[in-house]
Amino acid sequence: VSAFDWNKSGDKIAYIRFDETNVPEFSMDIMGEELYPTEQVFKYPKAGEENAKVSLHIYDLASDTSSNVAISSFNNYYIPRIKWTEENYLLSVQLMNRHQNELDLILVDASNNNSTLLLHKEKDAAYVDVNDDLTFLKNNSFIWSSEKSGWNHLYVYDKNGKNEKQLTNGEWEVTGYYGFDEKSGLIFYNSTQNGSINRDVYSVSIQGTNNKRLTTETGTNNASFSSDFSYFINTFSSSITPYVFTLNEAKTGKITREIKNNTTLSNKLKDYNMSPKEYSTISINGNDLNMYTIKPLDFDETKKYPLFMYQYSGPGSQQVANRWGGGNDYWHQMLAQEGYIIVCVDPRGTGLKGRDFKKMTQKELRKYEVEDQIAAAQALGARD
């Protein structure tokens, strides 16, 4: 995240200034190579304490002057993002209240440094997620993402923030926004349309039609597009396939070249008799929770096995995903070889299953997550 932004012609730079004078200090002992720790003191506003005073400024190269932007109607605010529009004199500013449950997108006229228009407003009973999806088109209409429907989706608005059109729709999440190609009129994004444990690259027209899946392998796909949106490099993996990198045509998704694969690793792992991850759901407290299970290779359903449950349940996180794992996977394989069943359950509060599922832990962290883990353990323990 950058606290400054140049306008399109490069003659003005907007920047954010932070005044921490009245922010209380926090000290921390740093344990190093010396016999005694060193003390680090830094500004740290705890809940209820005074925040840094944030101000917005614009520097003009031609006049070599910096001036303050008047945002008089907002007090005790955050400025999470600033971004120039297609007009050299119009700056977009995102403002949030301290509770972070309201976000205002406003326009600032750099000719007089006053906020001129409330372009868009987001409200949420819990909190508003901030991202970098905002994109201004040549006519200053803009693309925006929101959870207002209960799921994270893409919208387009005219230059006055009116005439809303929802571009993506359904009980699935847009998990990444890659950008808009003016030539083809296509928007490229990543989503869970193929199931909440999977990710694919898609395109949709600026009219919200012709939604098209561009990746074909089921698992986790992520794209990096060329600047002209002609091609993208796709990174694919699944629970059984290490990372594969390909060059794809943006319009069709067709693979034009395989850049790198992990065939050598895949062949080597065959010698280790790895137990597969089995993906499923488990009904807990009225919700179908995503779950994966790793069993011993010689699993016998007539026998009882010790159960090891692994989890991380931070807000919006995901552990049960169809992707190539890290170090924990090998640890879990070792446990399976020792006769354990390993289970991971994504409880309420984790991500990719809608706004309500993710944000229900607001102000109640450790309640629903723990309840679901306990209930899942009890349900699994009661199985024959």
Language model feature labels by segment:
Residues 1, 16-53, 73-76, 95-106, ...:
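A flexible loop/linker signature enriched in serine peptidases of the S9 family
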Residues 1-6, 12-68, 251-267, 319-329:
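Predominantly five- to eight-bladed beta-propeller fold
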Residues 3-12, 81-91, 133-141, 178-185, ...:
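Blade-terminus and WD-like Trp-Asp/Gly-His loop motifs, strongest in beta-propeller folds
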Residues 25, 88, 222-384:
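Serine-hydrolase catalytic core recognition
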Residues 60-64, 110-113, 158-162, 205-209, ...:
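Short loop/turn segments that connect beta-strands within beta-propeller blades
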Residues 67, 72-75, 79-97:
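Long hydrophobic segments that form regular secondary structure
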Residues 67-71, 117-124, 163-168, 210-215:
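A short beta-strand motif characteristic of beta-propeller blades
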